[in-house]
Regions:
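Compositionally biased, low-structure terminal segments
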Residues: 7, 21, 33, 48-51
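Basic/aromatic-rich interaction segments and small domains that mediate binding to polyanionic partners
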Residues: 13-17, 39-46
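A general secondary-structure boundary signal
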Residues: 19-22, 37, 65-68
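Short aromatic-glycine-(Arg/Gly/Cys) micro-motifs in beta-strand/loop hairpins
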Residues: 5-28
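Short, mixed-charge low-complexity intrinsically disordered segments
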Residues: 2-4, 46-69
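Intrinsically disordered, low-complexity regions enriched in serine, threonine, proline
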Residues: 11, 24, 38, 59-60
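A short, exposed loop/beta-hairpin motif centered on an aromatic-Gly-Thr core
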Residues: 26-39
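A general, composition-driven signal for non-globular sequence regions
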Residues: 1, 15, 20, 35, ...
């Protein structure tokens, strides 16, 4: 199987926090570096089994601000 790979410059990635609720209604979060909120959602679904099985459990995807050091 031949996969096409895209090279995305690291400078274009931004930190996103994906908030979701589990079956006990506890609010949890995962953080990802992504180009946009949609990609952050896809990454969350790929790396978090609960979100993969319950994609509608996501209730917020927020882009975090980085202050220049």
């Amino acid at each position: 199987m031949n996969q096409t790979q895209f090279k995305i410059p690291l400078s274009s990635l931004r930190p996103y926090t994906v908030h979701y609720r589990n079956c006990d209604n506890q609010r949890l979060e995962n953080c990802f570096y992504a180009c946009d909120a949609y990609e952050a959602r896809l990454l969350a679904m790929e790396f978090n089994r609960y979100i993969q099985e319950h994609p509608n459990s996501i209730d917020l995807i927020r882009r975090e601000l980085i202050k220049n050091i």
